[in-house]
Design a protein with these regions (language model features):
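N-terminal transmembrane-helix/juxtamembrane module of multi-pass inner/ER membrane proteins
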Residues: 1-68, 111-125
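Alpha-helical transmembrane segments of integral membrane proteins
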Residues: 11-15, 86-94, 159-166, 191
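Aromatic-anchored segments of alpha-helical transmembrane domains
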Residues: 21-24, 97-103, 168-178
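Hydrophobic alpha-helical transmembrane segments
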Residues: 63-83, 139-145, 149
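Interfacial segments of alpha-helical transmembrane regions
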Residues: 73-101
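Helix-loop junctions at the membrane-solvent interface of multi-pass transporters
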Residues: 82, 108-109, 207-210
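Transmembrane alpha-helix/helix-exit interface in multi-pass inner-membrane proteins
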Residues: 99-113
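Membrane-embedded catalytic cores of phosphoryl/pyrophosphoryl-handling enzymes
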Residues: 118-215
């Protein structure tokens, strides 16, 4: 029990640090919409580009656009449901709420997207820039999928392992993709990652919570 309480305190400390980091980053972006840090980071990322890399980066981001994203979520939930994993199917559907979270903050901060000649625009996007909805969604959806592959031992290992590897690939490649494509600044994707981790923690706690014993 003491070990369990210690683990909980550590996790709360980590989530608190993530929340503070996100709030500080939000304040920084609100007062400094275009910073030298963002410009220099974009220049470094976009310095080495070619047609093949353009295609790869577009492909990585593609699954986060409409209608691919909701189709992927609903399709994944249906697969879980078909194999009698009803609770998992429900929680997978909850990941679509990331769009509501990111859109609400975008409207509040109202940060413009990167534009030429400051950066090279490969993919033109709509909505505001902060935070990155793609990064938030990928961290939440693919992160939760990774958690399920770890927790649900009844799923065959030959499925759990590749799904986990692919999910982690998307999680860590999407921030690079969004900056490379000129769709976001460095601070946008960083905020999206932090917020995604916070949302993933909340969703995971709710999923792993054991029902109270009936009296």
């Amino acid at each position: 029990m003491p070990q369990s309480n210690k683990r909980k305190r550590i996790m709360l400390f980590v989530i608190g640090a993530l929340a503070i980091g996100f709030l500080l980053l939000t304040a920084f972006v609100f007062f400094f919409p275009i910073s030298s840090v963002d410009r220099e980071f974009s220049e470094e990322i976009q310095e080495h580009h070619n047609q093949l890399l353009d295609t790869v980066m577009k492909a990585i981001s593609w699954v986060g656009y409409m209608p691919a994203a909701p189709i992927m979520v609903v399709g994944t939930a249906l697969i879980f449901y078909m194999f009698k994993y009803k609770k998992e199917a429900l929680f997978v559907m909850f990941t679509m709420l990331s769009g509501v979270v990111s859109s609400s903050i975008k409207l509040l901060i109202d940060r413009p997207r990167p534009s030429e000649p400051l950066v090279r625009i490969i993919v033109k996007t709509q909505q505001q820039s902060f935070p990155s909805g793609h990064v938030l969604f990928y961290v939440l959806f693919f992160g939760f999928l990774t958690l399920l592959m770890y927790e649900v031992k009844t799923i065959p290992k030959y499925i759990r392992l590749p799904v986990s590897v692919i999910s982690l690939f998307f999680i860590f490649s999407i921030p690079y993709s969004r900056v490379y494509l000129g769709a976001h600044w460095f601070t946008d994707v960083t905020a999206g990652f932090l917020l995604g981790l916070i949302c993933l923690y909340i969703l995971s706690v709710l999923y792993l919570k054991r029902p109270s014993p009936k009296k």
